[in-house]
Amino acid sequence: MERISALGLDIGKKRIGVAGCDGTGLIATGLTTIERTSFQSDVEQLHQWVKEREAQILVVGLPYSMDGSLGFQAKQVQKFTRRISHVLQLPVEYVDERLTSVEAEAQLKSQKRFSTWDKGAIDRQAATIILQQWLDSRR
């Protein structure tokens, strides 16, 4: 079986949720939430996860508008992603992330792990959903 090493990213203005997968590519797991301070800091933290997980690809949630168009936030995500892809020298695949934060919050509530204070948990869970969708689409 081919080994898969991908990082799933939920990129927001304030935070980046990060998820990874097991080598079989079956299960995505939330890893961390990066508090965004500067591009350089974002890259350094992502680079550490890329090295640690031996990531071969970045799977990024793209926040399409409900009508399917690319709005302002989606274009910002693409711009940031192009930059990190270039610096980290990794390919990128996008996943439609509409409503993943809503789904993430619902999952955390059902698991009794939801806190209005921990926005990072939602971002991390959203990254997990994004990566899991991508993994499932490859089967």
UniProtKB/Swiss-Prot annotation:
E.C. code: 3.1.-.-
GO molecular function, one term: nuclease activity
Uppermost EC category: hydrolase
Keyword Nuclease part of the UniProt annotation: yes
Pfam families in UniProt: RuvX
Nuclease as UniProt keyword: yes
GO biological process: rRNA 5'-end processing
Compartments it resides in: Cytoplasm
Annotated Gene Ontology cellular component terms: cytosol
Keyword annotations of the record: Cytoplasm, Hydrolase, Nuclease, Ribosome biogenesis
InterPro entries for the chain: RNaseH-like_sf, YqgF, YqgF/RNaseH-like_dom, YqgF/RNaseH-like_dom_sf
Job of this protein: Could be a nuclease involved in processing of the 5'-end of pre-16S rRNA.
UniProt family annotation: Belongs to the YqgF nuclease family.
Protein name: Putative pre-16S rRNA nuclease
